Curated annotation (Swiss-Prot), chain B:
GO terms for cellular component: cytoplasmic vesicle membrane; Golgi apparatus; neuron projection; plasma membrane. Regulated by guanine nucleotide exchange factors (GEFs) including C9orf72-SMCR8 complex, which promote the exchange of bound GDP for free GTP. Regulated by GTPase activating proteins (GAPs) which increase the GTP hydrolysis activity. Inhibited by GDP dissociation inhibitors (GDIs). PANTHER family: DRAB11-RELATED. GTP binds at S17, G20, K21, S22, C23, S37, T40, G67, H123, K124, D126, A154, R155. Interacts (GDP-bound) with C9orf72; C9orf72 in complex with SMCR8 acts as a GEF for RAB39B. Interacts (in GTP-bound form) with PICK1 (via PDZ domain); a PICK1 homodimer may allow simultaneous association of RAB39B and GRIA2 to PICK1 which is involved in GRIA2 trafficking. Interacts with isoform c of RASSF1; the interaction is strong. Interacts with isoform a of RASSF1; the interaction is weak. Interacts with the DLG4/PSD-95. Interacts (GTP-bound) with HOPS complex components VPS39 and VPS41. This is Ras-related protein Rab-39B. The small GTPases Rab are key regulators of intracellular membrane trafficking, from the formation of transport vesicles to their fusion with membranes. Rabs cycle between an inactive GDP-bound form and an active GTP-bound form that is able to recruit to membranes different sets of downstream effectors directly responsible for vesicle formation, movement, tethering and fusion. RAB39B is involved in autophagy and may function in autophagosome formation. It catalyses: GTP + H2O = GDP + phosphate + H(+). A lipid is attached at C211, C213 (S-geranylgeranyl cysteine).
Amino acid sequence: MSDKDDIETPVVTEAAPILEDENCEPAKNSGSLDLSAKPESKSEPVVSTRKRPEFKHSSDLETSEVLPVQASEAAGKEAVSKDVPQTGWGYWGSWGKSLLSSASATVATVGQGISNVIERAETSLGIPSPSDISTEVQYAAGETNAKESENSSPVSGPFGVFSTISTAVQSTGKSVISGGLDALEFIGKKTMDVIAEGDPGFKRTKGLMNRTSTLSQVLREVKEKEELWTSNEVTIETDKKTHYGLLFDEFQGLSHLEALEMLSRESEIKVKSILNSLSGEELETLKLELEQLKEAFSLAEFCEEEEEETKGDEDFTKEITELFSQLHVSSKPEKLARARNTAYEWISTSLAKPLEKKEEGEKQLEAEEAEQISNSSIEDIHAFAIRSLAELTACSIELFHKIAALVLHGRKQEVSAIERSRALSQMTVLLCKELSSLSKEFTTCLTTAGASNSASYIQDAFQLLLPVLEISLIENKTELPEA
Amino acid sequence: MEAIWLYQFRLIVIGDSTVGKSCLIRRFTEGRFAQVSDPTVGVDFFSRLVEIEPGKRIKLQIWDTAGQERFRSITRAYYRNSVGGLLLFDITNRRSFQNVHEWLEETKVHVQPYQIVFVLVGHKCDLDTQRQVTRHEAEKLAAAYGMKYIETSARDAINVEKAFTDLTRDIYELVKRGDITIQEGWEGVKSGFVPNVVHSSEEVVKSERRCLC
């Protein structure tokens, strides 16, 4: 036990800068108030308009709570893989299953590269013991191979449980190994949240939004964990390049999401107060119309779409531009299209599927090109893939944020909220597909985590637009009574 | 090491439409001048690290607001979570200078219970021949509100760096003195991560191994 004492010291200093600052502030009790409020709020159902709590404290709390244990956990990978099963293996197991069934498609296509993929998945997700997992992968792959044939997309399935958890897992994974129980607890809570919803099969991502914390808050939390981890691992600076959350923030994805949430919340409050002020027939008519809007928001079939061949640059740009014009907002999706096309250019020039030994002859590889892309560039591909997904996702969120701003404050347009909702819904599908096919381009060296996260972020952002469209519908009604 | 910073400050940039807010920010964050740009929709985001003392970095999260009146209700919502602000006017546009009062009044109402450290920025100072606002009167106005005044040009890269870093330093001093504190539920100032007290897990592992021996 004496060794624990020795190890504990550095861990304490780790948290010191944050705690120090907080001790300085006079209004300290307000902080602790919130701390006690936090756990109970977790179990509360939907309160999406609730003022966002500060989460820094929660992570501090977790850290200080579990400090003694954490010290031993922090001792190293070996310690973790041995100790974890007792405390949290149930969690690992449950998400592992869904992870694996979704990963199995990847595994199937890659075939021989199985250990490669596992290793890659292991480094990205921070799965504690590669050997444990690989055994499970083989089981899972065997089980699901028949059902999930190659044409099932590796990213189409896991929107529900897996994506929510992998958000946490992917980013906290490293700190599970190095940081210990606090991260495990963090993942555990997220896992429990999802399990508590009791619907592991659900395809659409209600997951992140319908809980007490807002999406951007969850993501910020995750990013801060990543940052903490990154600053801990000062020696492995390059790994920052592959941290989805950090990159997503670097492309201002978090900020746009936060701004979108603000608009969404505001609209929601307005809608509610208007509904409260109405009665009788007026109320019923409005409710009916709002119901139609809601339908448009649930129409989008995000997954299980038939596979499409990768579209050309023009197609995507054309399609997104067309959908955008249906929205009648004075803005263009140029930035998004540019980011998307840059990614594909990069793929076609420098990647061209070098590691895959696929039977399908699509995009045949020149021998010299293959040599050019040596093993040393695998890291680059991985980094670029994560970066592209993060950028594209951030651009998509930015687009949704701008749409919200323009719907609310743009000049009056000859378009109904319903029409806009339908276009938005289609746009969401298009963007998710695009991300999915982009990530497929990177499949050989990527886990599916990035893409499924991206897709769920976009879908959540899309859902945030509902109140915005609702209020715009109401305002249009009141401004054009004759129409 | 770029991820390591002492604090994060959220700054807001406000002022009339077309005074050059986005251009100033882009010059500061991207180091280039964009001649043509569409009017900002709602709000845009930029970030940059600033080294205020050797080894002490501050991450600036800059909220670039739309100057257009129609977005005012959106941009208002952002004052509250900012610790600092650049209030811009165009020295060749008298009207934008006259509106400075209005901007300050508006922020005062919406920032509560917090406060924002503002700097008054006379922008487009490269266009001195078209000047409609003298330096003297701008300085007087700034002083009346307890602000600093600085003249900048995004096109010629004059004082752009200084405008942001001076403001950052001033805020940093206030934070150091405890006049501004990190608060629950407020995004204006956040603390970052300090590298030198951090021990990597590798070291921890090593030290444990030594103990076992």
